[in-house]
Amino acid sequence: MTTLKFRNNDKISAKVFILGSTEDINKIGLDQNEADYVKKSYDDDKKKTVVINRYTECFHIFFIDTTEDENKFMEQCRKKGASICKWLNTNKYEEVLIQNIGGKRCVKMGTAEGMMLANYEFKKYKTDAKANSLKTIYFLEGTACEDCVEKLNITVEATLMARDLVNEPVNQLNAEKLAEFISEKVRSVGGEAEIFNKKKIEALKMGGLLAVNAGSIDEPTFTILEWKPENPVNEKPIVLVGKGIVFDTGGYNLKTSNFMNDMKDDMSGAATVACTVYAVAKAKLPLHVIALVPATDNRIDGNARVCGDIITMYDGTTVEVLNTDAEGRLILADALAYAKKYSPMMVFDFATLTGAASRAIGPVATVAMEHNAEEIYKQLEAVGERVYERLVKFPLYEEYGEMIKSDLADIQNIGGAYGGASTAGKFLEHFTDYPWVHFDIAGTAFLEKAEAYKPAGGVGIHVRLLMRFFRDMVKKD
């Protein structure tokens, strides 16, 4: 991981200068020819990054208009950081110094964040892989608060950890290994963890998790991760629930190969919530936060559930299973019902749940829904705009509840041909009685190709959003 640090001098060969206007050009040590070149480049294209490549050092110079919408110019800084990171690695630089000349300090943080996120790579299974050269990003001492730098390092570390988990294939990370890894990580920073094995899950009668696991050669797990500091600002805990389908074949509603190839990503929700608790604990935030991670793969054998089976969930609800590929909601339902025992302040669930959500808005935003949490959702939405992990609210109309009524059981696990994201949300809502927000990350958790600071593969989506949301909660107290 690339780390962000302070240094007491600018004697370094690679520098990034962020300028607020052309008046700042003469403040960065350029000779007249270089300054004229930068000015002409700016006049030709105000969004261009100008590279001054000397024999012993290089400068990357770009301009940010901080009079624009802050969310947009911060995203511009992240993208600039990502592109500069690529150049630095291509040219084998190991360190870089970022300075903002005029304007707001936050542009420097955004640029560093973009570099750190863009420098991610997952090459552990390549026998001849060479790591990226960039190792350290520097600010000059006194030009940013130490706390802000520490926050960014922790948040990026957790985001990259989530990416790693999503990118691991199931033969390396089954449900048991996932549970062990996230438990060890949370304990390493002072949190607590408990893993329920199959016997315990059977005793709790978590029928959804057991039904999905019926065709697997590996046992399911249900992991509880907790960070409970002394005197937390929240009297009731915040509970995060993450879908942990470590691989999804679709069951007897078998996926075709083009839809199955990336189904190691079906535990992205689990990665998000587990790595967020890790970050909260490492940052020692005064918040009581719990993550619930039901985990299994969804495979086929002679014991696997088939269409038409009726199962009984943790809370006693009976469910007619009409599609074995709508399995994520079954394991989430048990976890959401289990969350009631904590009398939570709020509950958020994260799941690569429906193709309908992905098809509706693609990879540029996450579909979200809420029940009895309108103000909380508005805060999350605003934070999503700030970190550019945007949310689009879908409805939970009562008519969607009619679509999942069953003639043979209390409810069924799919609706009709339309409104698939909302009928899935309505199914989950049945198991809640607290302020709840549902995040369907099917379109945002895993990318086919890299986009600026987001890599191809696992994105680690919404760790950044949650950490900003939680820090805002602490500030308001």
Question: What residue ranges belong to the model's regions?
Answer:
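A generic structural signal for tightly packed, nonpolar segments enriched in small/aliphatic residues
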Residues: M1-T3, T56, E70, A179-D477
